Amino acid sequence: MLMTDIIAKKRDGGELTAEEIGFVIDGYTRGEVPDYQVSALLMAIVWRGMTRRETYDLTMAMVRSGDVLDLSSISGVKADKHSTGGVGDKTSLCLLPMVATQGVRMAKMSGRGLGHTGGTLDKLESFAGFKCGLTLEGFFRQVEETGFAIAGQTANLDPADKKLYALRDVTGTVRSMPLIVSSIMSKKLAAGADVIVLDVKCGGGAFMKTEAEARELAREMVEIGKLNGRRTVACITDMDQPLGNAVGNALEVAEALALLRGEYGGDLLELCLTLGSCILTEAGAASGEAEAREKLLDSIKSGAALEKFADFVRSQGGDAREVYEPSLLPQAPVQLEVPAPSSGYVNHIDAMGVGLVSMHLGGGRATKESEIDLSVGLVLHRKLADAVEAGESLATIHARDEESARRAVQQLAAAYEIGPERPERPPFVRDIIR
């Protein structure tokens, strides 16, 4: 089999066989097929697309490129959750302890932030001493004993995706539906959970800009999950504005803790209830959505979810005092308000622009090697359709110095659009695909 023949076949619109796809993935993972040939094939896929069968075969070849976790030694139903990424997305920090209180174990491999989106592992490192790197044995033990674990991906879990994603990132081939589907689902299938719930975001701060794109992605992923015998559900949710109010690592942790204390709600709580009810019903821990939502809300009211989160932080070496005293989390020395330039209603917030403000403050990575400042970021005081008077604060900037704070004030002000008419708030949860 020749790589040049496979490239030419896809270039001309042909359908690759499972054997041809396996040849490419196996050879590339072992270092026998060079970057330049895989780059050519990736670009051909971007232009010509892939059939549903090709996408499935690509996903499975990537799964087979490394280890597949066997979670059978952990008791009960095991679930996993994935978000396609957005601004202010601290959902896992709230959702996992809420679900774990109901006896459904959550085994989650997470990543770090890059660009305008934040990473769950970075947020968790706001807790002094927290360890993201667990051995496989330690990961399994914690899921069994604590009910959930969040750790960095093991070195040999889906190595094909690591190589392919790095190559796509530098060759202009990230935006391709079959490549996105296979990247996400190969990782989820290799992670071994019985139930997979996907949060597919759409809008200005999301990877999928339109609801139609998000719907297509969701359907493809759900089908691949089901073909592998996994109970798979996708929720299409709004990312035309940041999720919650806080953007930035320690600030988002503090907001998640406020939710677990029962002191914060809004779109973040609605998302946790939506995703959580899907997990509980698919896992057989609730008879339907109403019962599931009631159980999840009770986990907050009783304090069980907060206590579960403290157990989790303690188990991974973090200082659990910070769970009950968020003032101990990293604090930025400089805070500046962003005044509204006029009176009216918030007509639009550039979610990606908000994420970039946090990144430029030092709260995110421009490159994978960038160091981040866990304390910096921003807290929004006005969101879509909220009323505001001229001079009132739209947001508070949390910065390491006056210069970066003043620059962020100007950048964040530009992300807001204020008009005389109150716009309609679009539905936050657009659809649930099973």
Stretches found by the model and what they are:
Residues 5, 10, 15-17, 28, ...:
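Well-ordered secondary-structure scaffolds
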Residues 77-116:
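Glycine/serine-rich anion-binding loops at beta->alpha junctions
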Residues 109, 143, 151-154, 184, ...:
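Short beta-strand segments
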Residues 123-149, 219-225, 229:
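A glycine-rich helix N-cap at a beta->alpha junction
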